[in-house]
Amino acid sequence: MSGNWVHPGQILIWAIWVLAAPTKGPSAEGPQRNTRLGWIQGKQVTVLGSPVPVNVFLGVPFAAPPLGSLRFTNPQPASPWDNLREATSYPNLCLQNSEWLLLDQHMLKVHYPKFGVSEDCLYLNIYAPAHADTGSKLPVLVWFPGGAFKTGSASIFDGSALAAYEDVLVVVVQYRLGIFGFFTTWDQHAPGNWAFKDQVAALSWVQKNIEFFGGDPSSVTIFGESAGAISVSSLILSPMAKGLFHKAIMESGVAIIPYLEAHDYEKSEDLQVVAHFCGNNASDSEALLRCLRTKPSKELLTLSQKTKSFTRVVDGAFFPNEPLDLLSQKAFKAIPSIIGVNNHECGFLLPMKEAPEILSGSNKSLALHLIQNILHIPPQYLHLVANEYFHDKHSLTEIRDSLLDLLGDVFFVVPALITARYHRDAGAPVYFYEFRHRPQCFEDTKPAFVKADHADEVRFVFGGAFLKGDIVMFEGATEEEKLLSRKMMKYWATFARTGNPNGNDLSLWPAYNLTEQYLQLDLNMSLGQRLKEPRVDFWTSTIPLILSASDMLHSPLSSLTFLSLLQPFFFFCAP
């Protein structure tokens, strides 16, 4: 990860290309651009309602394929190529259980082509207004997809509308997932966090190449949703990513979401599983790595279903310390940020994947039993949770609604607000939002009680209603929803351009200062103040104080103790 991505034999050739060859506009076969590794040729598309064509470059390599001896290592430089490289086909997905994507298409009312799946997946897609060329210096937005770090793809997100309407460059990045992105031996032989290091490599590629597509390497905004937002939040805290971006947007995810690290007993159990798989001693890290690098990728994908501890780790490189400690110590660069949540984060999508039975209703006893198992709160203190969330709720549907609100609070809202406060207190400009609109397209697929569910804002941010290619992100949008999408694209792009989302013809979005005002994103915009303040106080003051007086733990508890108590919920409400 030295950052030296230029093959020595390419330096002179590349310099000649820059001086001698035109890079402007599409050729008869498609737009061509040079990179430091060789020439690529993309395609040109248009979107609904905009006269601006967009140059699209798909499957651009930012690192070498992580195969064989490169499995479970830091991403390495991609090799240069001599001939014009075709960049009009979607890259393979990183290895994953692709059945989830089929389920998501139905649940999220989206459609996209069938993609291949491979370990050879470290590619990015670029969307640029056709007029953009070297010297244009347009703002760059780099998107990291979500999917619980287990599923996801760059190609299900089409940046064409955002690029056309807002005159920005959009880059969508793939990174290793699951065991391929996070396997670790918890020592120097395989320190882990490969997925995050892939993201650093992609940002390094952007710094070195995006100017040839018309982007400004000194104005890069990273953004993402769910696991992608967790990635953005993590990159802010990592010294490895220092200087590679300048602004950040976190949609429904931050680095202190609690499920992201494993218990010690889970680590030990999982190493035993891997050792048994390889026929090695679990203490021999080098032997385990040699074995795993020779195994077929599908066998490793199957193996990963038997493990749950291969997640984020404090490796001393990407994460020099726990994210919460880095935040509290202000050990990060204070850059402008947008942080936000939806008003029903665990309303349907997440529980539907893992525990659909609770959506039909829940009695108080069942709800409290589930909460006890999730939060590890001693039974004698469950009455506090009951009083906070269920004291005036009696029907099965009322209790269900409160349970879903509780889960959304614990896993999304409270961590997001805590993170916003840390960023604010470090001197960074912060803008907070709550997305509140339920898309009309879900009228026949989601129950009426569901409001703005997890991931619902994404189709608005990307202008899904204006796409007309083979990626369908927003069918059946109403005219009001199209207007909301235009406003949200404008907010995001204005922020990418200036570090402040406010602009002409947009409702005022105040900074998140000590008054804690925030923008309620809806068909009719409005301002709110101190979002869910009683619930934040409950989880950061009342519960930790009670638990610190109990015998369940042997060390003092901080006001954020609840963040470390929720890991068993990983497979229930993973973003």
From Swiss-Prot:
Residues 1-20 form the signal peptide. Pfam families: COesterase. Its main location: secreted. The active site is at residues 226, 345, 454. Glycans are attached at residues 281, 363, 513, 524. GO terms for cellular component: extracellular region. Belongs to the type-B carboxylesterase/lipase family. It is found in: Secreted. The lineage of its organism: Eukaryota, Metazoa, Chordata, Craniata, Vertebrata. N-glycosylated. This is Carboxylesterase 5A. Its EC number is 3.1.1.1. It comes from Homo sapiens (Human). InterPro entries: AB_hydrolase_fold (IPR029058), CarbesteraseB (IPR002018), Carboxylesterase_B_AS (IPR019826), Carboxylesterase_B_CS (IPR019819), Type-B_Carboxylest/Lipase (IPR050309). Involved in the detoxification of xenobiotics and in the activation of ester and amide prodrugs. It comes from the Eukaryota. Disulfide bonds join 94-121. It catalyses: a carboxylic ester + H2O = an alcohol + a carboxylate + H(+).
